[in-house]
Amino acid sequence: MTNGSAPSLYERLGGVYSIATVVDDLIDRVMADPRLNANPLVDEAHHRVPPAGFKYLVTEMVCWATGGPQQYTGRSMRESHEHLKITAAEWEAFLDDFQQTLDKFGVPEAEQDELKAIVASTRGDIVI
């Protein structure tokens, strides 16, 4: 926090270590979700990509998107998801996993709302 300004979402979430802990749980949850793995393209991707690398990139992206000092170095959301042919139902399953993770860690409602808005802004690049 600088010059008396309100803390960023990144700061309110507790910074990189707290964000990484939440992302770790979310990615484990998503990678094991049978609703998502019913899509053979998603299932194959979940078994092709090492979880640690996936978690790193998602942590980097969340930190960047919430106002942290990190820079996201991965591919665009469209480029990294278009070949997976993710449906609206699969998107809803992901959102359910996301909500379960936020609730598990007791993320306050105001911060949840901001995070959900960030996630919602990516839907058009992810869902077919």
What kind of region is each of these model predictions?
Residues M1-I128:
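Core of compact, soluble alpha-helical bundle domains
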